[in-house]
């Protein structure tokens, strides 16, 4: 009884290991929102305070007419009103983030109130988490509208990161179509954070702009490309010297060159590379997992079930269609076979085998009694024959051989 209670007791801390991004992202968004407020206040303070002091001194010394002083004050008031509007927008954004965080914390707190895995409340909570993981997977796969619809139907908009992934997909798609404007704007908004990134996204975007200028192939664009390189590429000379020297070599090679590395630099596949690089950088800055959370959740279960035979040449789902239609092993299924390919095998300290094992001519081993019973249940097997439940092959009972385990 004690062992049974232990096996069904809910360990909330272990469950929450998978849900860390649920609170990490709102925290990161709140931090960035605060930094935006800080930058706005500092920028306006640097302008308004000196301007106010200068206007006051000029008025006292009669260097300005009353109309000039009023015009200067109007300009400062206009800037402060603009600051107020921006601050109000940021305040509304902060309230949204706080409300989102509150609902996410409430969702996680429910787990600590569930005593057992057998409790019906756990089934309800796990269903919500599965919906979250599905929406996360759809967002990362580009099925934005489907993800939004599912979130609305389930009423969990605040538990998923719709807006973040919508923006990410929009910018990634613009890069695939050959447009750098949105990505560069995003880099400008996150300039401070990008300095700590392991990726060099902004440099790669500026390099692509340079490549497109050189691709045009006429003198005026060459001049523009050199000016662009001095302004945007030269600051990276210490860290990206090899790429910058290669970029300079592009001036001597036409877009249809076969010489490497210039052929690869001119290749249109670079846009797909930039799109993937942006997604990796975006996820890194927002502390998002590079893999879908659904894959991470499945990994533990896949590893616990995986055996060496799951990816053998004979039973592989990619090479044996008959096997996939009859096998009940999740690892051998078409949907999960590739996902589990790089997972480690299950670590079993004990083996469980039938007490009457036999081997069929195709090398497969089964319990004799269970195999005979299954063959009878199938009904389409002749008397004195048995059917392999995995491959569907039929053999004579006399072809079965006893297996001895040493």
Swiss-Prot record:
- Short name of one Pfam family: CTLH
User: What does the sequence similarity comment in the record state about its family?
Assistant: Belongs to the FYV10 family.
Show where the CTLH domain sits: 164-221
The name of this protein is Protein fyv10
Zn-finger segments (RING-Gid-type)? 329-391
Keywords, ordered alphabetically: Cytoplasm, Metal-binding, Nucleus, Zinc, Zinc-finger
Q: Which organism is it from?
A: Aspergillus niger (strain ATCC MYA-4892 / CBS 513.88 / FGSC A1513)
Output the GO biological process annotations, alphabetical, semicolon-separated. Answer: negative regulation of gluconeogenesis; proteasome-mediated ubiquitin-dependent protein catabolic process
Cite a GO CC annotation. nucleus
User: Where in the chain are disulfide-linked cysteines found?
Assistant: none
Compartment(s) = Cytoplasm; Nucleus
Gene that codes for this? fyv10
Q: Which GO terms of the molecular function aspect are on file?
A: ubiquitin protein ligase activity; zinc ion binding
């Amino acid at each position: 009884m004690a062992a049974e209670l232990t096996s069904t007791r809910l360990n909330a801390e272990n469950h929450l290991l998978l849900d860390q991004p649920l609170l990490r992202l709102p925290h990161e968004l709140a931090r960035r929102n605060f930094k935006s407020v800080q930058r706005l206040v500092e920028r306006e303070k640097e302008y308004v305070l000196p301007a106010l002091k200068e206007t006051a001194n000029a008025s006292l010394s009669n260097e300005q007419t009353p109309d000039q002083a009023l015009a200067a004050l109007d300009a400062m008031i206009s800037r402060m009103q603009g600051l107020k509007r921006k601050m109000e927008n940021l305040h509304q954004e902060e309230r949204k983030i706080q409300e989102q965080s509150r609902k996410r914390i409430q969702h996680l707190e429910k787990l600590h109130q569930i005593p057992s895995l057998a409790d019906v409340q756990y089934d309800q909570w796990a269903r919500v988490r599965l919906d979250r993981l599905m929406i996360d997977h759809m967002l990362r796969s580009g099925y934005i509208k489907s993800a939004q619809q599912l979130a609305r139907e389930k009423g969990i908009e605040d538990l998923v990161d719709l807006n973040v992934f919508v923006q990410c997909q929009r910018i990634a798609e613009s890069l695939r179509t050959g447009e750098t404007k949105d990505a560069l704007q995003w880099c400008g908004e996150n300039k401070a954070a990008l300095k700590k990134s392991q990726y060099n996204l902004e440099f790669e975007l500026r390099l692509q702009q340079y490549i497109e200028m050189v691709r045009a192939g006429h003198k005026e664009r060459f001049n523009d490309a050199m000016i662009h390189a001095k302004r945007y590429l030269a600051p990276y000379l210490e860290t990206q010297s090899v790429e910058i020297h290669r970029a300079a070599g592009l001036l001597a090679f036409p877009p249809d060159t076969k010489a490497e590395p210039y052929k690869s630099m001119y290749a249109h596949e670079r846009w797909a590379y930039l799109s993937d690089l942006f997604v990796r950088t975006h996820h890194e800055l927002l502390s998002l997992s590079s893999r879908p959370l659904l894959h991470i959740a499945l990994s533990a279960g896949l590893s616990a079930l995986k055996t060496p035979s799951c990816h053998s040449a004979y039973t592989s789902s990619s090479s044996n269609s008959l096997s996939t239609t009859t096998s009940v092993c999740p690892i051998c299924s078409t949907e999960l076979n590739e996902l589990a390919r790089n997972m480690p095998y299950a670590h079993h300290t004990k083996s469980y085998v039938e007490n009457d094992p036999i081997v069929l001519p195709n090398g497969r081993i089964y319990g004799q009694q269970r195999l005979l019973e299954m063959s009878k249940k199938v009904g389409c097997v002749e008397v004195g024959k048995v059917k392999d439940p995995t491959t569907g092959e039929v053999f004579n009972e006399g072809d079965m051989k006893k297996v001895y385990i040493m």
